[in-house]
C-alpha cells in the first residue's frame, strides 16, 4: 500500500471477531469480510472458517484516508457509515473453475464518535442478515450474530477549537401527509424529493437532499417508535438501513414547534396521519458545522427566521440493460413538477438550551416573490442552484447528481469508482456552481415553473399537505445556564441567611408558656362567668352564701361541657404540658412499666397544679379591678391592621405593624414579602429590595421571592441580576406562567426579540395547559360548590402573601375598573345595567375574583356612587356557602352601605359578623357607630373601647367615644376623648359639627367653654 500523504490521516477499521455465525452449508462455513466506505471497497479479509460455536477470529484491518482538503471530509464521516459485508465461500464442485460466494449479512459501523473528539473506540455491531440468509434463523443461543469492531486514528480528527466551537446538525424528514390526490402509486415512477440548505464552510451553503420517498395509501397510522434510516441506497441487508439507536418517537401535537400544534388541529392531523395518502422517508441526514459555519448558521437564523424547505417530484428514468454506467438524457428528464415549499421557523434553535425542534409545517406553492419575502432567499435549491440535480435520475438509489472526486489512490478497489454519490448529498465544494438561470434573462429554463404562478404547487394548499421534520443539534447554539450556576449566582447576590438564635432556657420557656396558657384560659372562663351571671357579681361575691356559689359553679361547669369549651381548653393546654414533659423532665421515650408511668403522672400533676396557682395569682390579685388586660394580637391581625392603616394613608402606623410582625417572627418569609410590598407602595425601592432579598435568603427556592427580586432589580436598573433571578425562577418552576411572562417582559425591555418570543411562547403554552387542566377538573366537578372551591384555589395561587400593594378597605377607598379589581368591575357593570335581573346576578358574582382592595378611590366618592343594586349583591355574597377570598372587606362595604342608608340594625348585625371573623379597629368602630345610632350606649362604649384598644390613633374612634360620654353625662371622659380627637385631626366635618352641637346642648365636653 502506498504511503499516506502528510496532509491526510489514516482511519483504521479492525474487525477482530464474529459471533453466532452460520452459513448455507452448515454451522462451520468459510467466510470473509469486505469493508466499504463511501461506495469504495476498502479491502477483503482472509477466508476464515467459523468454529462450531459460531465464532470466527478475523483480525482484519482496513483503512481509508481522511483528508479535508480534497478527500474524505468531516461531513462524510458524519453521515456515511462503514459497511462490513460477511460472505460465505461455498466449496468448489467438480469442474468448477471459480469459487461461488453467497452474502450472509451486512453490519454498519457509525463513525460519529470520531467527530466527538475520540481517537479510538470499540463497539459490537449487529450483523443484519440479507433476505434468504441462514442468519435470519438464530442459533440455539438466541443471540443475534454480531461483529467486534475497533476504530482507530493516530490522533483526534478535530482540534480543540473545532470540538468546542463546532456542531453536528441532524435533519430527520419523517413524512409528508395529506398529499394531493393526483399523487398515485401506479403509472410512471416518481422520485419524491425534499431539500434544504445549511451553511457549511463559512458562508457557503450545503444542500441536504432527501430522495425517493415512498408514496403510501392511507389506512393506518405509521408506527412509533420506528427506526431512522441512512440516506444511502443499495444497502444489501434490510436491517442495515436503520441507524443504530436512532428512532422516530413522535409525541403530542401540543409539544411540537411547528404550525399544526393547536388543539383545533388535532382532528385534521389524526385524519391525515391515519386515513389520507402520505409520502414516507424516515431518513436522517447529518452535517458537520465547523465553528465559522455555526456562527453563520446563527446569524442566518436571526436574520431570516424562516427557513425554506423545498419539496418536488421528478419522473424516474429506467436505465436500459447494458447501459448502467452511462448517463443518457431522455425527454422525461429534468421535469420539475409539484414544486412546493415549507417555511420552518428556526428561531427556537436560538432559545437558550434548545437543541431540537420538531413539528408539522404546511406546504405552499413555490413562488419566488413569496419565498424571498419570507426567507430572503433568492435562489431555489432544486430549480436554480441544483437544476442539474434532477438529471441522472435513475431508479435504484438516493443519488447525488453532482460530481465528486475519487477517493485517494491508496484505497483498495475491485471496481471503478462511480462519479455518483449515493447519499443524496452534494459535495461542499460543488454548491458554488452559478445559477443555471441567466441573471439577465427572465425566461425560465426547461422544466422550470413560472415564477409568479404555480398551479401544481397550489394543490398542496388545497389538499392541506404538511411535512413532519425534525432538526437537532449536538449542542445548543445558545447555552443555557445550569441550575447549579443560577443557584450559585443567586446565593452570591443575596445576603447570607442569619443563623438562628440559639435557644436558651428551654425548661424555663416551657413553664412560662404554661403560665401564659393558664392565664388565657382563666380569662376565657371568667368571661364566660360574666356572660352568665353579669359583671357586677364580683362585687357581691362576699355577700353570697356557699350554696349560691356552688350552684353557679355547677351551672358554669355544665355550660363549659355542653358547649365544648372545656374540651377546647384542654386541647389548648396540651401543647404546653407536652413541652414541660420534654424540656423540664426530659421525657421523650415511652415508660418501661405502668408503675413508672403512674409515679411520673402523680409528680407531674403536683407540679402543674402548683404552677397553675402561681399563674392565677399573677393574673388575679386581690384587686381585680386594677388589672389591665393585655390584648394579644396574632400575626394575621397585625397584617390586617397594617392594611387598614394603608387605607387611611397612615403609612407610619402601617410600617409599625409590619415591623412588629418581623420582630415577632423574623424567620417568616411571608412577613418580609408583605413589608417589601408595602415599601413598594411607599416608593422606597431600596428598602423593598432589602426585604425581598431577605425573604430569598430564608428560602432560595421560593419562586415569588425570586420574581420580586427580579422586578426590583429591573426598577433599579440592575439588568444582569434581574435576568439571573427570572431565569432561576423559570428553572425551578418551569410551569410558572408569571415567571415566564416576567422573563419575556425583561427581554422586551432589553430589545431581545428572539428570547422575548421564547419566553412569551412558553408562558402561553403553560397557560393553555393550565386552562385545559382547569377545564377538565371543572367538567369532573359536581355542582356549583366544587366549581367555586376550585376557582378559589386558582385565585389563591396568584398571590401567596394575600393582598398586594395598594391594599385598602371599603370604608376608605374603592377600586376602579381594571384587571384584578373585580368588585369595581361589578360595581360599574351594575351602574350601567339598571335593568339587570336578580337571577342573572348570581352567575356574575360566582365568576368574580373578590379582591376589592387594589387601586381604590376615596370613600366619599364610593358612597356617592352606591346604587341600590349593590346592597343586594353584597348580601348575596355573604349568603354563599363558600366564602369569597376577602370576606373582611365585603362585610365592611356592606356595613358602610347600611350606615349610609340608616339601616342601623342591619349594620350592627353585619359588623358583629365581621368582629367575630376578623376583629379590627374598623370593625369595632362600625359596630360602635351602629350601636350609638340605635341609642345602645353601653354596647357602643364597649365596641368603641375595643376599637380604641386595637388602635388609639384613630380620630373617628375618639369622636364617637366623646359622643357616648356626652350622652351618658361623663364630663371628664368626654373632654379627654375630645382632646385626643382634636389632636389627631378629625377630618369628618359633619361628625365634628354633631359633636359641637351636642356639647352645646349638654353644656360640657369642650375645654374651651
Curated annotation (Swiss-Prot):
Keywords: Cell projection, Cilium, Cytoplasm, Cytoskeleton, Flagellum, Repeat, TPR repeat. One of its GO terms (cellular component) is outer dynein arm. Residues 410-428 have a biased composition (Basic and acidic residues). Gene3D superfamilies: Tetratricopeptide repeat domain (1.25.40.10). Its main location: other. It is found in: Cell projection, Cilium, Flagellum; Cytoplasm, Cytoskeleton, Flagellum basal body; Cell projection, Cilium; Cytoplasm, Cytoskeleton, Cilium axoneme. It comes from the Eukaryota. Axoneme-binding protein that plays a role in the regulation of ciliary motility and cilium length. The conserved TPR domains are dispensable for ciliary targeting. The N-terminal half is important for cilary localization and/or binding to the axoneme. This is Cilia- and flagella-associated protein 70. It comes from Macaca fascicularis (Crab-eating macaque). The gene is CFAP70.
